[in-house]
């Protein structure tokens, strides 16, 4: 019996809808997320306008063992974006539902923010949640005790933490104390100069796992403004 607090699923999956103005050799007919939902998860008016001009659909699905899912879903996303570029199309990620506004060469596992969206619905109660990490077999993350007035700094810390989670999962169980460095944050935010940032500045966090909702609960052990950005 495993002593790991967080269970590791055998396989994970992710799906993309390639939407094109003209039909390809094969066409799928999966019901698409509505515009309100796509907008809620960050899709822009410009991308939604492009989507309206692309009525034809090709479903691209990725399923792989959890141990290799990160590389598999990265390659699947690149494939979808490559096809979109070839056929003047657009790619919709199905979970979380959003239009992907990336070029194939921009796809990066290190740039963790590419792989999740933030749910601010309960920010007034001090809670910040991710949506998207499930595709790696990870639980979604909830950060507790977030100050709504300064949540942008917590957003940044979360980008650094998810950078580490994606890189270390499933080899390392995430539960317990952890340290998020300014370099981790830079990688998670997609900073091209991340590798040159000194590792000195950091903030400690405590990560717990709640099996019922299957979520990681994160508590910051300090003020990001003082620990990282002062």
What is each residue range found by the language model?
Residues 1-42, 47-53, 192-196, 206-208:
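Long, low-complexity, Ser/Thr/Gly/Pro-rich intrinsically disordered segments that act as flexible linkers
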Residues 1-2, 9, 83, 157-167:
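Amphipathic alpha-helical segments
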Residues 19-21, 62-67, 167:
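Short, flexible beta-strand-to-coil junctions
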Residues 26-129:
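Internal, hydrophobic cores of structured domains that mediate oligomerization or house catalytic pockets
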Residues 95-230:
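Aromatic/basic-lined ligand-recognition segments
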């Amino acid at each position: 019996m495993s002593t790991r607090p967080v269970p590791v699923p055998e396989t994970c999956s992710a799906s993309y809808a390639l939407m094109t103005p003209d039909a390809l050799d094969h066409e799928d007919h999966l019901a698409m997320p509505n515009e309100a939902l796509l907008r809620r998860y960050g899709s822009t008016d410009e991308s939604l306008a492009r989507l309206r001009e692309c009525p034809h659909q090709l479903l691209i699905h990725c399923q792989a063992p959890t141990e290799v899912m990160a590389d598999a879903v990265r390659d699947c996303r690149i494939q979808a974006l490559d096809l979109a570029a070839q056929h003047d199309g657009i790619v919709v990620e199905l979970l979380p539902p959003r239009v992907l506004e990336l070029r194939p060469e921009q796809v990066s596992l290190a740039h963790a923010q590419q792989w999740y969206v933030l749910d601010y619905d309960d920010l007034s109660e001090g809670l910040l949640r991710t949506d998207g990490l499930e595709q790696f077999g990870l639980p979604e993350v909830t950060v507790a005790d977030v100050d709504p007035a300064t949540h942008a700094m917590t957003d940044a810390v979360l980008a650094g933490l998810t950078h580490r989670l994606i890189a270390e999962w499933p080899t390392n169980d995430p539960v317990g104390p952890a340290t998020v460095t300014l370099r981790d944050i830079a990688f998670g935010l997609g900073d091209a100069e991340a590798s040159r940032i000194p590792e000195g500045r950091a903030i400690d966090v405590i990560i717990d796992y709640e099996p019922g909702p299957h979520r990681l609960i994160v508590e910051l052990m300090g003020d990001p403004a003082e620990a990282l950005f002062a």
